[in-house]
């Protein structure tokens, strides 16, 4: 049998076996070409799951008339000029095979116009030798490619296509992935002349989380933790869901190119296994930016995998970038029971670390913090504390009217109506508004100073007497003032939301008391079988989260009837080491500058007999 050169159409059909697997493959190649052309608007029209029609329209740079013939030829591309370019690929496409391969297994027409041309032109290939025909056509700036009757001339390939619904689901998933790779591009997807997806361009980086919510779901955007690490030629940023979250969104990108790379997935899986022992990966959207010269994208027919020149370095970088977010969380929480922690001394050098970590620094994906932190809105299937009103659904507590409503609200002037209802249940105010100024003046005249000794212990003088006390006895009143000013105590966000499994009855019990927890600084998402803890009061941040929730559940069963009872409960469960933390030091400075703190401390203070100790010196 003699060796012969294959006809152009047959050669292209063989090449199409690698490039064109199904309609989604066609959409991928054509949309990537649009992105490479600088398009900011892309319209994707699908009919019958891509079996009948695939049409891609864009407003990109377009193709000049004299280049249309080359555009449908094999090994013709505008993205590579030399071997050096192959080692520094910044575009999504580069092989110059897609259009020729697609046109060999379908009826393809290419219409395009550059902004410098007065007229648009249309090209199509036909016949045994795939001769390209060009003719004028009416068309705006940009390019439109129509692919009709895919695999019409290869019956064996067409027979293996799935149902229209299945094929379109693959296209839909592909467009979701592309939408998260380019926030600055508007993308519209229609099926059988009905708009299915519409992603508007997000030119402001702070709006990126809105597209993440649109693609990955509202729960992902609310619960996802933003990650950012690295600098220079290797950076990582994105979002990761907590372990155990029911979300199948698992997208990875390398230089904005969609990836399903084994090395990347292995590093992510290993990070979660080492920290939490989780066998199943949570949802994530992770972007890796690397010097193009350090990665080979020409190792997979569909470009789904890459080869890093320093694979071990990249693997360890991804591993550590994720662990640096999760490990600090594990380190801050201990497994000691809640009651034991309250009596445990804490080293002065062991201070609470910032919950935001180091991953928010840097320039990559520099979104405002307010857009990245978990929001208070209600997530799908659960209640987010801080978002539901006191009289809302879900068994939330409803306060009963009280005769002292006006007096109480006069004192708590800054408290919202939702929170003020709790004070109507008999919350006692130790110092009235009318007496406040007089007390401050009187105490200021009699007080010298408050001297902090260690771990909340203090010494102060009042009315020419010396006393020893502990700042914890002034905490409740200080928290009262914060609620008066802010509406609630400020919670501290966990580095990674923690899931605590509970029975349905316990979840309902916690939901019934949710407005109290908002006042204290908790933020919980309550599901039917578990509670997701997103924030804890600053004074309880160092506790084991599971034990804290269990103790909170016990308090719900009591139940505590007013705000003072809840604040007293919180003070009793504040661990000793909190008084050595940076969080408390800031609160302590404010308390020391408040003249009323003296009166609060005197409730639980020991008088120091100076003369007795002076006699010891003689």
Swiss-Prot record:
GO terms for biological process: mismatch repair. The keyword DNA damage applies. It comes from the Bacteria. Residues 348-359 have a biased composition (Polar residues). Pfam families: DNA_mis_repair, HATPase_c_3, MutL_C. SUPFAM superfamilies: ATPase domain of HSP90 chaperone/DNA topoisomerase II/histidine kinase, DNA mismatch repair protein MutL, Ribosomal protein S5 domain 2-like. The keyword Transmembrane does not apply. Residues 377-388 have a biased composition (Low complexity). Keywords: DNA damage, DNA repair. One of its GO terms (molecular function) is ATP binding. NCBIfam families: mutl, PRK00095.1-1. Belongs to the DNA mismatch repair MutL/HexB family. This is DNA mismatch repair protein MutL. It comes from Pseudoalteromonas translucida (strain TAC 125). The gene is mutL.
């Amino acid at each position: 049998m003699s060796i012969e050169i294959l006809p152009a159409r047959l050669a292209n059909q063989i090449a199409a076996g690698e490039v064109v697997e199904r309609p989604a493959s066609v959409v991928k190649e054509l949309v990537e070409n649009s992105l490479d052309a600088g398009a900011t608007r892309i319209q994707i029209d699908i009919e019958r799951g891509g079996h009948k029609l695939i049409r891609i329209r864009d407003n990109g740079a377009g193709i000049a008339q004299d280049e249309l013939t080359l555009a449908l030829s094999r090994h013709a591309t505008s993205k590579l000029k030399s071997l050096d370019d192959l080692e520094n690929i910044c575009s999504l496409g580069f092989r110059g095979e897609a259009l020729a391969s697609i046109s060999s297994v379908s009826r393809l027409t290419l219409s395009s116009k550059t902004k410098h041309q007065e007229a648009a032109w249309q090209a199509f290939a036909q016949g045994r030798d795939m001769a390209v025909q060009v003719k004028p056509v009416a068309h705006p700036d940009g390019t439109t490619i129509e692919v009709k009757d895919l695999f019409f001339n290869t019956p064996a390939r067409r027979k293996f296509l799935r149902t229209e619904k299945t094929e379109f689901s693959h296209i839909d998933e592909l467009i979701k992935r592309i939408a998260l790779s380019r926030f600055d591009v508007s993308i519209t997807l229609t099926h059988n002349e009905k708009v299915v997806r519409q992603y508007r361009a997000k030119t402001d980086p702070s709006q990126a989380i809105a597209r993440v919510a649109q693609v990955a779901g509202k729960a992902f955007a609310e619960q996802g933790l933003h990650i950012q690490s690295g600098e220079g030629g290797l950076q990582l940023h994105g979002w990761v869901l907590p372990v155990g979250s029911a979300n199948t969104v698992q997208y990875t990108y390398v230089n904005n190119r969609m990836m399903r790379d084994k090395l990347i997935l292995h590093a992510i899986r290993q990070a979660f296994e080492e920290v939490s022992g989780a066998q199943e990966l949570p949802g994530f959207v992770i972007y890796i930016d690397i010097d193009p010269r350090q990665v080979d994208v020409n190792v997979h027919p569909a470009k789904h995998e890459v080869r890093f020149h320093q694979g071990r370095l990249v693997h360890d970088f991804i591993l550590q970038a994720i662990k640096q977010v999760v490990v600090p969380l594990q380190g801050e929480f201990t497994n000691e029971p809640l009651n034991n922690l309250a009596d445990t001394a804490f080293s002065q050098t062991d201070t609470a670390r910032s919950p935001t970590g180091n991953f928010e620094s840097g320039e990559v994906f520099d979104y405002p913090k307010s857009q990245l932190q978990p929001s208070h809105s209600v997530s799908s299937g659960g209640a987010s504390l801080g978002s539901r009103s006191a009289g809302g659904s879900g068994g939330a507590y409803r306060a009963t009217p009280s005769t002292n409503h006006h007096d109480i609200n006069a004192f708590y002037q800054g408290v919202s109506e939702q929170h003020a209802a709790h004070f109507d249940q008999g919350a006692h105010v130790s110092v009235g508004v009318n007496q406040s100024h007089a007390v401050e003046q009187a105490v200021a005249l009699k007080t010298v100073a408050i001297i902090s000794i260690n771990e909340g212990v203090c010494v102060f003088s009042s009315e020419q007497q010396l006393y020893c006390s502990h700042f914890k006895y002034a905490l409740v009143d200080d928290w009262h003032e914060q609620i008066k000013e802010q509406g609630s105590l400020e919670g501290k966000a966990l580095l990674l939301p923690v899931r605590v499994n509970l029975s349905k009855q316990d979840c309902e019990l916690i939901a019934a008391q949710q407005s109290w927890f908002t006042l204290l600084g908790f933020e919980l998402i309550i599901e039917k079988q578990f509670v997701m803890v997103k924030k804890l009061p600053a004074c309880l941040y160092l506790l084991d989260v599971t034990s804290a929730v269990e103790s909170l559940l016990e308090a719900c069963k009591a139940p505590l009837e007013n705000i003072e009872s809840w604040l007293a409960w919180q003070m009793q469960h504040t661990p000793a080491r909190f008084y050595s933390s940076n969080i408390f030091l800031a609160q302590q400075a404010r308390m020391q500058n408040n003249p009323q703190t003296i009166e609060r401390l005197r409730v639980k203070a020991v008088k120091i007999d100076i003369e007795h100790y002076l006699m010891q010196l003689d």
